[in-house]
Amino acid sequence: MRKIDPKVDEAIQTLNIKDGPTRRKLLGGAGLVSATAAASALLAACSSSSSSAAGSTIGSFPKTPAWKFYFVNHVTTNAFFTPTQYGMNDAAALLGLPNPVWSGSDNQVISQMTSAFDTAVAAGAAGIALAAISSTAFTSHVTNAMNKGIPVVTYNADGEYVNGQPQIGTNRLCYVGQSLYVSGQSMGAQIKTLVPGGGDIVIFIPQAGTGNTQPRFDGAKAALGSSYTVAEIATGAEQSVEPAAMKAYLLAHKSSLKGAFAVDAGDTQFLGPQLKSLGMSIPAGGFDTTGETVPNIQSGTLDFTIYQDPYLQGFMPVLYLYLYNISGGVLQPPDTDTGLSVITKSNVGPYVAQSRYQGSTTAEKYIQRPAGAINAPMASTST
């Protein structure tokens, strides 16, 4: 098999050249030098065309300024948000825009988040996506941005819940993320199936009171009712300290616990290994698909995890901010529930593949879905 020149391969991949005369000429043209030169010319033409406008065009969309969007996050280095960053960058590439700025705090420090938000406003951001983990801390900041004509959407967290009712606290345009209280209720339903009749259980949470995880705990506890004694154990906002805090509690209550669960990606991925290290075989589950969570579902160490699609939480805000800007504000971004899929050993198969959508690889690749019937429950909600 003839070796393909790197420049030729780059042109084919970058320009997505399908099978046809151009592709055949590049792969088997009149010699390596001419093929390489042609590939270089194609890449140069593409680069020149893209840079001649502030923002390049996709399909029949008009040329736009190079809109710079900003994402403000509460745990910027957390592995859960790796696919979120891939999603925002992929959407920007699709629309011919620069990669959004990823900023905020790496351990849920509100002052660092508001500082990052204000920096985006001062920079004249074309739009801001905010993980609003508080219903009060961001109110004036979001209002200020909106008053300056900067559209703001929230993702992953949208304020807090009080007695099961949302307290949003900002005049953002829309929320892109999971319905957090409802997802907690779903967790409660799973727990009741696994631990029938009640008893002592623990639910680990990184930091009590924050809008991204507290609603899940509250929803789960409400669904469980009085027959369960539910311990809420905070393990810390930084993933490096979570396993030790978790192990200490499990060890101290090993004889009485009937189940162990978690409301975030970090605690969930550490839960399986901690149970295994202590020789504990009790019902367990949590949220998301990071780290060892999927292998632990496969092995049966964890019974379930609830998936919320972090890739969409990066992709959709960029798309919505783009459409809002390009339409003159006519295309108002809609609230978007990114999902509540309960993953168990019986349906974990599709989540095993390495992909950008799960944050497990940087490779941009098409993943063929399984052939056959699409198994989905009967729809029960609608807008």
Question: Where do the model's predicted regions map?
Answer:
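Extracytoplasmic "Venus flytrap"
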Residues: 58-62, 66-95, 100-117, 131-135, ...
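Bacterial lipoprotein signal-peptidase II cleavage site
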Residues: 47-54
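Hydrophobic alpha-helical
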Residues: 130-147, 220, 231, 235-296
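N-terminal secretory signal peptides
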Residues: 1-22, 34-45
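N-terminal export leaders
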Residues: 22-30
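Hinge/cleft segment of the Venus flytrap/periplasmic-binding protein
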Residues: 55-66, 204, 212, 223-227, ...
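Hydrophobic alpha-helical segments within soluble ligand-binding/sensing domains
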Residues: 62, 112-113, 174-201, 242-244, ...
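Flexible loop/hinge segments that line or gate small-molecule binding clefts
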Residues: 136, 140-182, 290-298, 302-303
